[in-house]
Design a protein with these regions (language model features):
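A short beta-strand-loop structural module common to alpha/beta enzyme folds
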Residues: 36-49, 171
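Active-site loop/turn elements of alpha/beta-hydrolase fold enzymes
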Residues: 9, 45-47, 70
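Helix-loop-strand module that forms the ligand-binding subsite of alpha/beta enzymes
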Residues: 50-153
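Hydrophobic/aromatic beta-strand patches that form the interior of the parallel beta-sheet core
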Residues: 5-7, 41-43, 65, 122-124, ...
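A structural motif corresponding to the C-terminal end of an alpha-helix
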Residues: 32-39, 113, 119, 156-165
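Glycine-rich phosphate/pyrophosphate-binding loop and the adjoining helix
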Residues: 21-24, 140-174
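N-terminal beta1-alpha1 ligand-phosphate binding loop
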Residues: 1-36
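A short, flexible beta-alpha/helix-coil linker loop
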Residues: 10-14, 128-136, 172-174
Length: 174
């Protein structure tokens, strides 16, 4: 795994969420990856982008580092829009062939038609929530882990065949 796509999924809100922590985390990842011989390309969801050019980055990448703040228990809406555009537009070419099922072969399962089987991904998130709220049956997330709370994003990558690396999060951000 030498080619890494770093996606900056920050959505700015003036005086509330400027994006400095996201930039700092991306800078740290960039330093580590560069020092270890990785080749890096970047995507910034807030920037104007070409879907075709972004899909070429997805095709090129061996690994995807997806850095974003968690807003209202999920992806910022601009980031969700980016994900929807990339994964849907990549059908039949980059992200998935079909949903995996076959009328001719009942052993083929839903979610097995991904074209990203040679790729790995990592979610790196920032949370206002303290870490003590995860894996705590009395906590806000009612016993769920970080990965369980982010199941929709994980399943999106899984549907496309990508393998999950360990997630990372910074908590108590405000």
């Amino acid at each position: 795994m030498k080619n890494i796509l770093i996606i900056n999924g920050h959505q700015k809100y003036d005086q509330f969420a400027e994006g400095n922590l996201t930039k700092s985390l991306i800078h740290s990842a960039e330093n580590f990856l560069s020092e270890n011989g990785f080749i890096i390309k970047y995507s910034v969801v807030e920037s104007k982008y070409s879907v075709e050019e972004e899909l070429e980055k997805f095709k090129w990448a061996d690994g995807i580092l997806f850095q974003y703040p968690v807003y209202w228990a999920g992806l910022p809406w601009l980031t969700k829009k980016y994900v929807d555009e990339m994964f849907s537009s990549g059908e039949k070419s980059v992200t998935f062939e079909d949903d995996g099922r076959s009328r001719m072969d009942s052993s083929k399962k839903y979610g097995s038609g991904g074209l990203m089987k040679d790729k790995k991904y990592m979610l790196s998130m920032t949370y206002n929530c303290p870490s003590s709220e995860f894996n705590n049956k009395d906590g806000f997330w009612e016993g769920q882990s970080l990965d369980q709370v982010n199941i929709a994003t994980h399943k999106t990558f899984k549907f496309c065949g990508a393998s999950q690396l360990e997630s990372f999060a910074i908590f108590d951000v405000y």
